[in-house]
Amino acid sequence: LSQRSKLTVVGAQMVLVNTVKERVNLMKNRKTYAELQSELMKRYPQGVTSGGVSVDDIIQLKIQNTYDTHLDIARDMAGVMRADMAAYDENPENFTQSLGCWSGFHAQQMIRSVKRLRGTTKGAYVYLSGWMVAGLRNRWGHLPDQSMHEKTAVADLINEIYTSLRQADEVELNDLFKALSAAREAGDIAAEKAAIQAIDNFESHVVPIIADIDAGFGNEHATYLLAKELIKAGACCLQIENQVSDAKQCGHQDGKVTVPREDFIEKLRACRLAFEELGVDDGVIVARTDSLGAGLTQKVPVSMEPGDLASEYIKWLEVEPITDTSPAREGEMLLSLNGEIVRPVRLPNGLFAFKENTGRARVVEDCIASLTQGGADLLWIETATPDVEEIAGMVNEIRKVVPNAKLTYNNSPSFNWTLNLRKQVRQGWINEGKISETDYPDGNALMSAEFDDTELGREADARLARFQHDISTKAGVFHNLITLPTFHLTAKGMDELSNGYFGEDRMLAYVGTIQREEIRRGISAVKHQHEVGSDLGDTFKEMVGGDRALKAGGAKNTMNQFDAA
């Protein structure tokens, strides 16, 4: 390397070390090796308990237990999110990301991968999708995203995710303590100091979870009770939507029904009270609005004075005039709007309709009310397509009232990303006069693989690659997430493996598509016994039994074949 390149590498390493230290410092319950050693030696001056347990072993177990309770996790991760939000306010390129995970193992492997890639977990979260809980993690099979699954499933998954992330801490710290023991046995003081420094600077795999609480699973009190369970499981961030709880739909399906803003604000307050009661003072609330695609409301709120929340909600209702030819009927609801008596359009199921093309205006008002009266910290605007300009336009209006408004954005698998981006490029180029309408087909034909290596296909892919950067720097998106990637990844991965394994490739299908790639990419799970804690068991057996320990990691363990990996 040139001297300039060496300086660049050293500088990058210093930034990484400082970043990791910042993350470690945010974990308030962590003590250093020396601090624990000092405390324990005061209790056990001989370096061993009366029962023969080594102080060194106690130190190891205390450090490996990175969190005593999941409520401690919620408190610390809320601080992490707040710090990240402040960093975004200073520079919108400091956006954060997450992937939706439907098991603890998915979350663990995601964060392990992030640490291998970046050397830190900074900016990486876990998203817990209500859709995937409904579709994959409930007792009644695969259900649609309509709040039909049991409430406890969400808290159970949060608990599972953090158990898996904490076990990843244990496994890696156990390896560091092995290095410390080896250094001491060899009398290598420099290696011993390096091992202790690595232990003290270890960055936990524990990261913030954004937990989907749907529409609250009931009234405001039910929302509060469920929120407490999610927080106690470790959630520092709750995402709640303004749909009717018992009529809830996936945000990318039709038939969505919203609640009046007063009702939604009460649920936001319920979440805040849950955080405050449990001592998670920095807890983060994401207020999601589905109004852009929702054309119905379940009830009409009561307006007490002009300009209040109810009147601002009612003004968007589809109404019909009362006339001689269309008089009021017995038992019919009537409204006084703009000095006229009108009837709100009501469906046979009792729901009320909004005027066409009012979704955007309702979204802006929803967001302002959630931030200014509901105490929400972040917004979520559910959209039908991935369009930076559309989101930016709404955010700019919101920021006229709340200048630091920030969003979480769903980079949803419900979007046909290839088709949408290619359509956007095509239309943009036509508007600019760069191409004519006949140069590329319109509609679904743009999905054809024949356009992959065309100028349009390459430009669409380039926009895909920078989409999250663009939406964060231009449209106020603090957090980018993909809701269902592990659902689709599992489906695609099993299809790929099954086609080869049950086809002609058989074992080559497994080795070629999985094991060889694991080895060459340094994926730790290739040593699957080690990944699930086999070495932890051996270490503990040594702690209590010494030379009598019957260990699994001996010479005959076939995992040794992967030592070169």
Residue ranges and their predicted role:
Residues 411-416, 486:
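Short beta-alpha junction loops
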Residues 243, 412, 535:
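Histidine-centered beta-alpha loop that forms part of the nucleotide-sugar donor binding/catalytic region
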